[in-house]
Every structure is written in structure tokens, then in C-alpha cells.
């Protein structure tokens, strides 16, 4: 099992989260690939520019290295995976190509990180976190919030996941531009068979039975969108992505809408 995060330094020997690291300069985001960079969208395509206006890129530390994906929920709140938490975070919105300055981009400082109180870093249960921005984002064509779903998705529901993670696995290749892939919500029995005694109500699996399409390392915290609403967040999966019979595992946001709303109200 592997978390779909990218970190800095050497590769961890155990499960990894999907995090992608890049350096954001004052006016341009230049992507850097560390030894831990291993996952991106597999089997997808370059997203149409501004087609995922809620997509966020999390930037960690004073060097503003790209860490994870996320989704804009309101002018001042972003949601991501809990395992993406770091002491210093900024959020880049309105991005398409991480290697270029873009007129649509906005980079905002995170002033508050609220991890779900029951997050378990060992089991990856309750893997979500809310980020409060220092100032509201400017909403427009390239930057727009998405609503968290009220209802849990039924098996077979068509969804889309997006991110800047690796486009190949196990050998990593990272794209400059945001990638999208269409996948389906997996039946519970498929999810349980792939990951026995591991899946909780706070998790949902998504992929395609034949494999070849998946989120991957570098995509952690990114949005799984079904029928125009935010259904999940990239959380974890197999070390090698897009294997037949092993869908990706996502935070099941239909189980957390009340907590999300209460947290965003409690400023």
C-alpha cells in the first residue's frame, strides 16, 4: 500500500502518500522532481485549461515546493488530504502549467490547518484537512469553488480525478500541465477484495476493472469529482498504480459534509 504523496529527500521504504514537489518562484512555478516523486494521473489526458477551476496546488516550506493537490470549497477555504499537512503551506489557484507563470494564477498563504480530529496516519482513515487562506481568492473563470456532495456515489458512477502526479508507474514521469482521467466508483466488494480489512466507511474506491487508469503519487489530496460535485480526495493505493483489480482509494467526502460545514463556519 502506498500513500499518494510526494515528499522531499530520499524515498520512504514503506507506504508513500501522493505528493508532488515543485518550486514556486515569485512570478512563476517551476516544477522540481525529488527522489520521492512517484505518482501522477495514469492513463489520462491533459485537462482543458480552466476546466477544473477548483483545482489547488499545495506548496510547502519557505521554498514553496509543490506537495499535493486540493480543491477550493469557498473563497477562503481549501480541502486536501490530512497526510498533506506541513508546518508552512501556501496554495496556488488558477494553475494549469506548473512550469510557467500564468496570468490566472493566485498564490495565497495558509493561516490555519484543520485536520479531521479522528485522522489516523497508520490506517489512513479520516484522511482530510481544511486549509483557511489568509485572504479570499478572486473568483473568476479560472478559479471557482466546488460543492461537497451530500450523497454517497453508487457503484459505476462516472467521475473525474485531476492532478500533477506521475503519468507512469512504477517509473515516474511528471507532466507540466494538469492531467485528468475518467474513472468509476468501484463496488464495495471489489474494494474490500483488493484491500482486505483495510477499507472503512470513510473511504471509497474508484478506477476501472481492466486497470490502466488511476491517480498516483503526486496526486494526493486532489479532487475526485462526480456529477459536478466533490465526491472524494486522492488518499492511497498500491505502490504501483493502475493495476487491474486494485482501484485507487479516496477519502469518502459524503461522510464528512457536516464536519466540513461546521469547521468552515467556525472561523
Curated annotation (Swiss-Prot):
Its EC number is 3.4.21.-. It is found in: Secreted, Extracellular space. Optimum pH is 8.0. Gene3D superfamilies: Trypsin-like serine proteases. One of its GO terms (biological process) is protein maturation. Belongs to the peptidase S1 family. Kallikrein subfamily. PANTHER family: KALLIKREIN-14 (PTHR24271:SF48), KALLIKREIN-RELATED (PTHR24271). This is Kallikrein-14. It comes from Homo sapiens (Human).
